[in-house]
Regions:
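N-terminal mitochondrial targeting presequences
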Residues: 27-35, 41-43
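Short alpha-helix in the alpha/beta-hydrolase fold that links the catalytic acid
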Residues: 81-85, 199, 223-233
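Short beta-strand/loop motif that positions the catalytic acidic residue
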Residues: 212-215, 219
Length: 269
């Protein structure tokens, strides 16, 4: 087992190395002027009492047919993934009319990192199978994502996705969200938390949502076996799951993964 500081360095290094901000800016403003960054927004859903914090959005077309919510990993922000979703950035949406919403997690003390404050969707106590799980934090983050979904037009198809810790929240919301327009779920380098709480906590109609999981076979942070176990649990529950591994990829992303996600979205939406 690696030391906590080393594991946190791997987490932070992996999440921040995914997309270079400079490349993101040039693609969005120069080559693809039609994809407009909507900027940061901070709102509070009074009905739920949930502060949604800041988020960034990229929109192409006046009336999105598809909205993707993508959650970053531990220690990162929305900026770390924005470049993957501008046209030509990596992930291709199956419609010219879309919106991508990238929330940023609130800053929390992370037990695994000796209480250091960083953007986190929930606390992490350890990275082994027997570690304590922050159930309350996971469910709070899932509710935040569900509140964002509720703000979208009911006719818009919704995709929930994320990387690492963000993927764990996306999977949780994908199984629990009651919104009928949630159409697909994507998780990269991630795992399904609270697996024993299902099927009792599944939302009506959740089993209709296809799930696409992706993992590097050299991941030293979230083990590939966690991804495999998540796939198997989802299949036990009755979900249609696709699972892809990428040779030599650590806790990161790669062009082949983006291509696979693009193909999944094209076939699922």
């Amino acid at each position: 087992m690696q030391s906590a500081p080393l594991l946190m360095m791997l987490l932070l290094r992996a999440s921040r190395a995914l997309v270079k901000p400079a490349a993101r800016s040039s693609r969005c403003s120069a080559r693809y002027a039609s994809a407009q960054p909507l900027g940061k927004r901070g709102v509070t859903d009074g009905s739920e009492g949930i502060t949604l914090f800041g988020s960034e959005a990229i929109q192409n077309g006046a009336a999105p047919a598809v909205t993707v919510f993508w959650l970053h990993g531990l220690g990162d922000t929305a900026d770390g993934w924005a470049g993957a979703f501008v046209p030509g950035g990596g992930v291709t949406l199956p419609t010219p009319d879309y919106k991508v919403v990238l929330p940023t997690a609130e800053t929390l003390p992370v037990t695994l990192n000796m209480g250091m404050q960083m953007p986190a969707w929930f606390d992490i106590f350890g990275l082994d199978a027997g570690a304590q799980v922050d159930e309350a934090g996971i469910l709070k983050a899932s509710k935040r994502l569900e509140a964002l979904v509720a703000m979208e037009d009911p006719s818009t198809k919704i995709v929930l996705g994320g990387f690492s810790q963000g993927g764990a929240v996306a999977l949780t919301a994908g199984l629990r969200c009651k919104a009928k327009n949630v159409a697909a779920v994507v998780g990269t380098s991630t795992w399904l938390p609270l697996g024993d709480s299902y099927p009792s906590k599944l939302a009506d109609g959740a089993l209709k949502r296809p799930v696409s999981l992706h993992h590097g076979d050299a991941d030293e942070v979230v083990r590939t076996s966690w991804g495999v176990a998540s796939k198997e649990r989802l299949e036990e529950l009755g979900f249609k799951v696709s699972f892809a591994t990428y040779p030599g990829m650590a806790h990161s992303a790669c062009p082949e993964e983006f291509d696979a996600i693009s193909s999944f979205l094209k076939s699922s939406l």
